[in-house]
Amino acid sequence: MEQTWRWYGPNDPVSLADVRQAGATGVVTALHHIPNGEVWSVEEILKRKAIVEDAGLVWSVVESVPIHEDIKTHTGNYEQWIANYQQTLRNLAQCGIRTVCYNFMPVLDWTRTDLEYVLPDGSKALRFDQIEFAAFEMHILKRPGAEADYTEEEIAQAAERFATMSDEDKARLTRNIIAGLPGAEEGYTLDQFRKHLELYKDIDKAKLRENFAVFLKAIIPVAEEVGVRMAVHPDDPPRPILGLPRIVSTIEDMQWMVDTVNSMANGFTMCTGSYGVRADNDLVDMIKQFGPRIYFTHLRSTMREDNPKTFHEAAHLNGDVDMYEVVKAIVEEEHRRKAEGKEDLIPMRPDHGHQMLDDLKKKTNPGYSAIGRLKGLAEVRGVELAIQRAFFSR
């Protein structure tokens, strides 16, 4: 695997010098300063590429080229936004950057309720608490009909939890959910959030798939023409939330994408921390079935709790993800490609890490502190080395 590291640009508290010292050779970054939907110019792409290369690294993957909400709702200037997206892909290809991670999650990108969940060893992790999320949705957001998405027990627990929250607890929970986490291109006030949810009131799973198909049929041929590989990121968490459909959550969703646009430019990001939240997702089977279309991997683990919809981000080699079997399946896919004469490695990043050691005293991007990811990268690197030596060095 190609060892990569997500970098949020010049304002990231983790420097490119830090990235290189961590042992990564590739950088995963994006032009976050360009508004959603606008074309990434060749000039801006080359400027970022030069910064990365001057640090002795390569820009391996774009994460992400965000998709304008008009495309997801099939309203407004969606045709212009699609045309802009096509041009951005052409410009990236012209600059030699050919792997693009993206997602099709409506309104919200990845979501957590607690950004400072303290683990038994004193480090901090990200957590999604189903009951706190229900309390937000029913008692803070007050979304009409939200009760239909929860069990009677969850509704009662959410009311009880809300009753114990201070004003600061409520404000913090609201910020965590709607203000935008690292990599998310949208942040909202509560009123803005309600208005954006209203745009989806008539969009169910079938309609969102229809809108996604329009996007894929416009984008994938351009990607194929210029040699770009599109790698869709799964929903996080991988299930409907806030009354919004989610359509990249299961192996069935992956198959739908392939059936909709059967091009090798239409590929996947295997994010084990997102797909792995669902107990019914067999990660190794996903890799084996869609291995030739996996162009990027996020390797991390999560741990489901007593309520199976509640989870926290575990250490990379712990939790519900069998990292050994996952890495083994990825390495096997790389060797299959090598046997076909393809030498390209699959870019891997350790994804999120725990906030730990000296980083506990620093301001960090949630999930993206340096030391926790350094630990995760080293652990996954060790797993891969052992697999390579044991199975492929003879």
UniProtKB/Swiss-Prot annotation:
GO terms for biological process: D-glucuronate catabolic process. GO terms for molecular function: ferrous iron binding; manganese ion binding; mannonate dehydratase activity. Pathway: Carbohydrate metabolism; pentose and glucuronate interconversion. Its cofactor is Fe(2+); Mn(2+). Its EC number is 4.2.1.8. SUPFAM superfamilies: Xylose isomerase-like. It holds the Pfam family UxuA. InterPro entries: Man_deHydtase, Xyl_isomerase-like_sf. It is an enzyme of class 4 (lyase). The keyword 4Fe-4S does not apply. The keyword Lyase applies. Keywords: Iron, Lyase, Manganese. It catalyses: D-mannonate = 2-dehydro-3-deoxy-D-gluconate + H2O. Signal peptide: none annotated. Belongs to the mannonate dehydratase family. Catalyzes the dehydration of D-mannonate. This is Mannonate dehydratase. It comes from Escherichia coli O1:K1 / APEC.
